[in-house]
Amino acid sequence: MSTIAGESSSSSKMPENSQPTTTEKGSEYLEQLANEAEELRKKLDQERHKLNDIPIQQAAERLDVMGALGVKQRRILKGHVGKVLCMDWSLDKRHIVSSSQDGKVIVWDGFTTNKEHALTMPTTWVMACAFSPSSQMIACGGLDNKCSVVPLSFEDDIIQKKRQVATHTSYMSCCTFLRSDNLILTGSGDSTCAIWDVESGQLIQNFHGHTGDVFAIDVPKCDTGNTFISAGADKHSLVWDIRSGQCVQSFEGHEADINTVRFHPNGDAFATGSDDATCRLFDLRADRQVCVYEKESILFPVNGVDFSLSGRILFAGYGDYRVGVWDSLKCARHSVLYGHENRISCLRTSPDGTAVCSASWDCTIRIWA
């Protein structure tokens, strides 16, 4: 019995020169990859630093301080009975489309404040809306996971001509037309962006890269249409090549969800707004963040940003009901616009730069000029 027990005891011992398990090999490999990634990150930061020859505030020291703008509230558009979630200007510089938590999409005459069209969508929380370049149709969508396109006409019942052109696997958070009325770009809570053919409803290109919900997209005004930018809950802003479907640049810096993104008029930079109560300016050529627009007294999220026509002014809509006016080059706040009675959800400058429009949870859209 003792001999058998001794053999059993010796056989239960592991050999001293045992080989690493598959799990151990995998852990070592992952650690090696993490170290390589960290080294590459350091090299990338060094290359970015070489391009950052001078801080933007220092470069702007010789510029004169901006004088009084004289911007005031000129129009209030009332008609929604729920939180206004999104708005967009028509390229005719006169009409505005808005979408709301009440399930309504309204097309307004910004001069007269009259409602020209009102549509009831099959879902509440219509989170996105956009005018086509021709101003002859609008796109909208939200919690129904779909993007619908509606031709605008005074002769027919336009809701009968509504057609579905896109379907995501989660809510649609943003949309915009690309170059013409034929292509539409959407962003979704399913972490993807996609380009769709308006006529056929076919998916043309899918963009995978975000690790969280996509909240905002934008296309540069001066570009030929080969890039766009997206941002969202993963705190990253990604620049995409439309032709290849690949992410070509990634920017980080925010400490919370990014709610809004907007290209600078020259197309070489973009601004973001976040739940961390800051706006940030990123330079595509320098491949880095170049400015943070913040104040200790600002504690509320930024839900909408846009530039003036020259790019010198950055408008930002906050959760504290105010519109902040920033000098984008001196990185200093110039003034504040008061009027809304609830958080601002969206903000856009008119195509000719003569006005700014803000949408709010107070059920109104306001035009400032």
Swiss-Prot record:
InterPro entries: G-protein_beta_WD-40_rep (IPR020472), Gprotein_B (IPR001632), Guanine_nucleotide-bd_bsu (IPR016346), WD40/YVTN_repeat-like_dom_sf (IPR015943), WD40_repeat_CS (IPR019775), WD40_repeat_dom_sf (IPR036322), WD40_rpt (IPR001680). It holds the Pfam family WD40_Gbeta. WD repeats lie at residues 79-109, 121-151, 167-197, 209-241, 253-283, 297-327, 339-369. Residues 1-28 are annotated as: Disordered. The keyword rRNA processing does not apply. PROSITE patterns: WD_REPEATS_1, WD_REPEATS_2, WD_REPEATS_REGION. Residues 1-24 have a biased composition (Polar residues). The keyword Cell membrane does not apply. Belongs to the WD repeat G protein beta family. G proteins are composed of 3 units, alpha, beta and gamma. Interacts with G protein gamma subunits gpc-1 and gpc-2 and with egl-10 and eat-16. This is Guanine nucleotide-binding protein subunit beta-2. It comes from Caenorhabditis elegans. The gene is gpb-2.
